[in-house]
Each structure stands twice: as structure tokens, then as C-alpha cells.
Amino acid sequence: MARQHEILGMNARNFLFQGRYNRLRSKRIADSKLLTKQVLKQAKLATPKLYKQFKTESKVDQFDLTKLPDSFVVKPSQGLGGEGILVVDKRDDDGWLAVDGRRLTTQDLRLHILDILAGRYSMLDLPDRAFIEERVRVHPRFEAIACQGTPDVGVLVFNQVPVMAFLRLPTKESHGKANMFQGAIACGIDIASGVTTSAVRYTDEIKFFPETRRKLAGITIPRWDEVLELAVKAAEASGLGYCRVDVALQPRTTKTGKLKSTPMVLEINAQPGLKIQLANKAGLLSRLKRVEGLKVKTVKQGIEIGKQLFSVREEAESIEGGVIRVGIFEDIEVVDIFGDRHPLKAKLDTGAFRTSIDEVLAKKLGLMDPENILWERHYHSALGREERRVVGITFYLKGKKTKTAASVTDRSKLKRPMIVGRRDLLGFSIRVKESEAGQEA
């Protein structure tokens, strides 16, 4: 569970991140779903197809609702918390059926749209715009763990880095809405793998979907890398430095019968809630501080930083496979930029947080390639102000593969060109051999 000093509170969110990194123009984009759609379309990012939008009552009266597809969604442009969203499942005689089983006539739909225009669901209690868009179906991966509505994935993006994510599952209690305050379930997601780790309902941890024995941990999110890429690009397109991007997977079957899915942005939230921390059992503040100020040059780099920094390495999983005994000095294999392994001797140092590698060796292995440099940090030492790069690295220790981030340093005067820090030693038990006791690094 997260420590108190790692948790992000509302005041810190508003002052340190939302207020500092979100410009007013960008907030206005996020506050309007229609404006968000326009910006995403210009950036060529996927979002549900827009069928019709309404600005005035006369436009509602003039439009022939019977020309709509069998299934669609009616939304307010500036709604809050899922209020005012009406999901139509299919046609029924001379009307439609909503996902909650209600029968809807043409007049029912018109009245609902007019309520939206009157500002009934507006976050500002002001007249709003209504629109009708493509309905995103439930992906087969989630059919057994969702009720009535479509699950979505919320990715919190800061400084072009995905720092935390959750899967929201509608329930019977939430009436098909992915709203945690109404009873929807939130599952924390490991950024590195796209696999759910734990789940909460309101503030209580749960292990199974209600009224079933379906486990909520261990669910793999389809097309995870594409979801992350879409989220980071959407945040970039909106101009928001700190936001949550909600993504849904639109499933479809190809002519050959294969299942394909397309990640689509549902909306962008410039003031994301804080319950994502409960779902992940982790604090946002510590994660945000780790990426604040980093110079992220590309979307790919931002995603790689998020994966390296915030991967979940469950201790239980390590113990299941048995604790691996090692000494202070061990032979390891480091993978170069082409995927080939190179043997070398390394020191296992629990006193160091991060793994580090000699600069000359890193260059030789191709790890200093610009595409592989995760970020650069400046720090002060006895020699003055110095720059240190952090690169992506993969190595094998006692047959166990570890993909991590390593600091690049000058170790030319030391015996071993690499140190493995405690961050990458989970599942290992270090035993000091008598012959190692007096040796230097």
C-alpha cells in the first residue's frame, strides 16, 4: 500500500500539477467533448464517429431520429461524471431499447436531448450542446466482467509519460456507467505489462466481480501499447501537461472471422480524480515527482520511461518461483541494441537504488543510441555540475530476465563495469561469501 507522503491530495493536484501544467485554452478543450473530438480529428486520433450535434431546439425538431443506426449514444458536451449519457442498445418496434432495458420512443429521445440543451447535466449549470455518436461495444475480453455498459481504460499522463492507469468496469449498481462514485469497479493496471493488479469498489478492495467468481486481477488489456500511445498523443494534442485520457476498445470481426479492436478516445479529463491511487495501491505524488522536469522528446520515449519507472514487480510472484540465491559478485548477461547477449561480471548492491553501467560499455553495446536514452539528469558533485543519462537495459541474472532503466556512469577505475541496484533484485537472496567479503566493486 502507498505511504502517506506518496499520496496526491486534492490541493496538491490543483496547485502543483493541474494549475501549473494545464493552460486555460487546453482546459476548455477538455471540458467540451465536442471540442475534444474536433482536436483529436485534426490530430488523426481515433474517437467514436460523430453522427449529429445539436445547438438549438429547432435543430432537434428538424432532425429525423429514425435515420440513426440501430445502436448509438446520446451525450452532453459538457457533462460531468457520466450524467446525461444515454446508451441505446437496439431498435424495438417503433422505438429503441436502452442498455438498462428501458423502452424509448422518438419523443423520449427528443426530450432527453432538449434537457441536455437546457443545461440539466452541464458541469456549469449553463445551456449545453448535445450530440449523438457511435456506440463502443463491449470487447469480448470484458464481457464476463461488465454489466450493461462499456468498460474503459483511464491513463493518467504527465509530461508525456503514462504514470498510472486503471480499468473501469460498469456494474448493475452503477447502471452501466463507468463511474466509481456510483458503484463501478476500478482495477489498477501495471503500466509495463497492461495487466490488472488489484481492484476496488468505492473504497473497499475486492477480488471478484460482483455475484461471480471472476477474478479482477490478472486481466490483460488488449492492444496495451496502442492504448498507451493513443493516450499520450491525445494529451499532447490537447496541450494538457497533466490529464487523464479515457480509452475504450471498439471490437470488430474481419471477413476472415478474426477479432480486431481499435482503441478510441472517449474523453480527456483536465482534472482527473484521485481514486486511481486506491485501485493501484500506489501514490501519485511520488510518481509525478519522478517525471517532473524530464525532457521527453518523443511519444515512444515517454511510454518507455513510464514502463521502466512504474512497472509492478510483485514480490509474491517472485516467491512463487522460489527465492534465487546469489552472491555480491555474479556473472550476468547484458543484451545489446541488436538483441545479442554479452557476459560480464557485476556487483549486486542493495545500497544502490538504481542499476548503473559503465559509459564505455554502454556505448559499445549500443545502449547510448538516442532512441534508447530514457532521460537525462543534472546533478552536483565534487567535480561540479554533471550530466547523467539513464538508458533502457535488459540483462539476465541466474537465468532471470530483467528489463530496467540504468544510469550511465564512469566506472573505468572500478573492477566491475556494472552494478545491479536493489530495484532489480526482487526475488533474489544475497549471501555474502567469505571470499567476497573484502573485495571492492
Annotated model-derived regions:
Residues 75, 85-109, 158-205:
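Short, His- and charge-rich active-site/binding loops that engage polyanionic ligands
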Residues 62-67, 237, 250, 254, ...:
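A short acidic-Thr-Gly-centered motif at the start of a beta-strand
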Residues 290-441:
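Pepsin/retropepsin-fold aspartyl endopeptidases
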Residues 119-147, 175-253:
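A long amphipathic alpha-helix within ATP-dependent nucleotide-binding catalytic cores
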Residues 218, 222, 249-322:
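C-terminal active-site "lid" helix and adjoining low-complexity regulatory extension at the edge
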Residues 154, 246-248, 345:
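Short, surface-exposed charged micro-motifs
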Residues 173-182, 275-280, 366-369, 414-418:
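A short, polar/proline- and glycine-enriched secondary-structure boundary/capping micro-motif
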Residues 8-22, 26-152, 159, 351:
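Active-site nucleotide/adenylate-binding loops and adjacent lid/helix of ATP-dependent enzymes
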